[in-house]
Each structure stands twice: as structure tokens, then as C-alpha cells.
Amino acid sequence: MENFPIINLEKLNGAERVATMEKINDACENWGFFELVNHGIPHEVMDTVEKLTKGHYKKCMEQRFKELVAKKGLEGVEVEVTDMDWESTFFLRHLPSSNISQLPDLDDVYREVMRDFRKRLEKLAEELLDLLCENLGLEKSYLKNTFYGSKGPNFGTKVSNYPPCPKPDLIKGLRAHTDAGGIILLFQDDKVSGLQLLKDGRWIDVPPMRHSIVVNLGDQLEVITNGKYKSVMHRVIAQKDGTRMSLASFYNPGNDALIYPAPALVDKEAEEHNKQVYPKFMFDDYMKLYANLKFQAKEPRFEAMKAMESDPIAIA
């Protein structure tokens, strides 16, 4: 079986640049996921983020999660749970405006560390978007500019912990879905696994690696690339032992950004005969639809947006 794509970003600076770019392109076309090493974020920064995130969970969130589990009677379930996930989360919004000062449970050291980490992730996300542009034959910054609404992009981090689960066969850590947004950068636990992606009808483990960043593509990049790159179904399997940490940072279009296939990637004949596979829409409209259909296939969402495009009153 094919190996999960691992990209060494340092190789972009030397004789292996062409081969590395080809590897990124293949990962985007055939996996929708890849894992970065030597990505430029210092290991000591990642170690500090991990230490403080795990400490925050133990101090502020672990007991709340135990109380929620007890309240819902989840430890004694006998049938599959399909309406919730075995995860404890909070969300840090970075752009267009930050909420990090408003979250009550974070101490000042954690806030400052996460502000620094966010800047590094934002820079990396934009560098990756430019690499995708290069592979796609689009002008530099095309994707970044497409993501810019009137207030810039949306960027935020979902901080998740997946505690030990007594019934991992009946409760998912996170149910299968594709991500709605643009490009997602994941800093995950290297000791407790659980993330899987769907490839060729099989669930494949995303290997946990120390100090790596896992990258996956969201629905918006599938639309903009006219299907050349794909968003892929993925899930988190709950584990009986160990608490898994996950920080998923979503670099998404701004709410009023207009999303549609890049003209350079659209077949002219299909365009002339109005046989477009992908719709044109405002990102916020897609997110409103996604909120109710997250754990379903993406194709009906695209079709619903096409219907809205042709008859907005019918969907309103």
C-alpha cells in the first residue's frame, strides 16, 4: 500500500525542489492530506504549546467533560452514539478579530504562547497556499487573495482533547466529515493516535509524528481548483487509553469572499455549455449550509449551492 505522504519542506531550498513540489501536488490530488516536517516552526515552541494545552485541559476542562459524560450516561451506552463526539474543545479565533483575551480560563502565559504560535501558523498557511498556486499554474497569491473578504481571511484554532473512552466501538472521537474551509494545519499528539482519512474506500491512519504539522484541504480548495485537489473525509477514533491532544488551525476565506473555480482551471467547453461541476457562492452562505450537514457527504452541499446560485429566492 502507498505510504502516507510526508513532505520535508527544507528540500524546497535545494536540488530536490522539483521532486518535493511534485510530492506536494500528488498529495493534494490523491490524498487531500500530507504531513510536514522541517516546516520552520521551532520545536521548542511546539513543546511549550503542547505542555500548556495539556495543562489547561487537566486544570480547566477534564472535570467538566467527566460531568458531561455522567450527565448523558455515555459510559453505559449499548448502541452506537451518532449525535455527539467524544471530545472536549474550545475555539481560539485569530482573524479577522481575536477572542483570545476574552476566553476566561486561559492564563496570561498560555495566551501569549498561543498568539506567537498563531502568527507562525498563519505564515506557514500562506506559504503553503503559494506553493499550491505554483503547482496549479496560478499566479502567486491567487489563493490568498481569493480568501480575502472585505475584512481579510477567517483564521482560528480548534483546541481539542480526546480523553480515554470506555466504548470506542460505539462513540467516535469525531464523526467522519470533510472540512468546510480552506487549508487546515494540525498539530496533533504524537503519543496517542486516532486520526484517520478515507482513501479508496479504506480508513487509513494518519501517523502521529513528533513536531510534525498535518495539512489537509477543505471544501473551498476543491471548488477553487475545480476538483483538481480534493477535500477528503476524515474522522477521529476514540481510544481506551491516553488523552489525545489536537490543535487544528483553519485558514479559511473571509465571510463575504466569493468562491468559485479559478478561470485558469476551468475547461472552456464545459463553461460554454454551462456544465460547471462546482458552484459560485459566498463563503458565509456555504458555512450556514455546512452547519447542518457537516457529517454528510460534500456533493449534496455543492449541489445545494448550485441551486442557490441559479435561484437564490428558492433557497432563502
Swiss-Prot record:
**Amino acids binding Fe cation:** 177, 179, 234
* Pathway noted in the entry: Alkene biosynthesis; ethylene biosynthesis via S-adenosyl-L-methionine; ethylene from S-adenosyl-L-methionine: step 2/2
UniProt xrefs under PROSITE patterns: FE2OG_OXY (PS51471)
Q: Which GO terms describe its biological process?
A: coumarin biosynthetic process; ethylene biosynthetic process; fruit ripening; response to molecule of fungal origin
Question: Its Gene Ontology molecular function terms?
Answer: 1-aminocyclopropane-1-carboxylate oxidase activity; 2-oxoglutarate-dependent dioxygenase activity; L-ascorbic acid binding; metal ion binding
Query: What is the tissue specificity?
Result: Leaves.
* Induction (UniProt): By wounding.
For this protein, the record's InterPro entries field holds: DIOX_N, IPNS-like_FE2OG_OXY, IPNS-like_sf, Oxoglu/Fe-dep_dioxygenase_dom, Plant_2OG-oxidoreductases
The reactions it catalyses are:
1-aminocyclopropane-1-carboxylate + L-ascorbate + O2 = ethene + L-dehydroascorbate + hydrogen cyanide + CO2 + 2 H2O
List required co-factors.
Answer: Fe cation
Q: Where is the Fe2OG dioxygenase domain?
A: 153-253
Any keyword Membrane?
A: no
Q: What is its EC number?
A: 1.14.17.4
Protein keywords? Ethylene biosynthesis, Fruit ripening, Iron, Metal-binding, Oxidoreductase, Vitamin C
Q: What class of enzyme is it?
A: oxidoreductase
Record's PANTHER family?
OXOGLUTARATE/IRON-DEPENDENT DIOXYGENASE
| Protein name per UniProt | 1-aminocyclopropane-1-carboxylate oxidase 2
Organism name: Solanum lycopersicum
